[in-house]
Amino acid sequence: GKTLRIIMPVLNVAFVGSESLAKKIAKKGDVRDIESYVYKEERNGEIGIISLLRPLKHPEKIRPLLSVLNVAKVGIIEISKVDSALGEICVSFGCAKIEKGLVIINSQVGDWVDPEQVRIILEQSGLKNWELFEQLPDEHSIREKLFSFMDNLEREVSSLILPVDQFFNVKGVGLVAIGYVQSGTVSKHDTIQVLPADENGIVRSLQVMDDDVDTAISGDRVGLAIRNLREEALHRGCMVVHANSNVLNKNLSSTLSIIKAPFQKRVLQIGDVIHAAV
């Protein structure tokens, strides 16, 4: 059925932890490389939405984690043991400049996690302002903390940026592009521009979590049915923006300054191949 959406405040939370804790906090949505959990509550006369984005396959794959960090404003890290994967997670959040978050120690039977050791890791990885829970709080307390973060974040009025991670042709629908809305909103009948191909199309319809919607908002994983666009214009990693928004500039070459991350042992050498999440 058709779902009418009023633009509501949404808090995107990068969640690294167990499926069981995520399910307590919010309702599970679609699953690919990233699980999504959504919780809605009316507060002060408007609906607030908490959207947990839980990357899968870490530490084997870093890409889902980086995709989540690109759209998240705050974070939750659930700790069952201290290992190198935890260090990588904390450094990733620190490098992504996610300054607000909750760290929850939830050690399993027989595995004790030292809160002081965790505090040191947080301090060293740039997460010293995160709140540490030495034992698992109830889900209501976690939600209240997240809503307080939402209340303190400035409401952004930002332009549409939607990186595409897959696309295909659907019989009877046509060309469909799928990705997370990194910022802004996109609506039915909008004229969109695909970069770097620099070709325009029109949004025929949108689906979020298998519902037809009129508008998709920041943090949504959306399927965009597009007409008047060549399939060749799309590729994995291409960007969808509003036509004539000039929100992205084309650069043929860029100069980067690299800040050394905490715990980084290697120094970059000429000829090294690096993977960048921008």
List the model feature ranges, each with a label.
Residues 3-45:
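Conserved G1/Walker A P-loop phosphate-binding module
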Residues 47, 265-266:
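Short Lys/Arg-enriched alpha/beta "domain-start" segment
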Residues 44-61, 77-80:
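Switch II (G3) loop of P-loop NTPases
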Residues 189-191, 271-275:
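Exposed beta-strand and adjacent loop surfaces of beta-rich binding modules
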Residues 37-46, 51, 69-72:
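Switch- and interface-adjacent substructures of P-loop NTPase systems
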Residues 125, 129-233, 239-243, 247-260:
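Conserved catalytic-core segments of large NTP-driven translation/proteostasis enzymes
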Residues 62-129:
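Conserved C-terminal guanine-recognition region of P-loop GTPase G domains, centered on the G4
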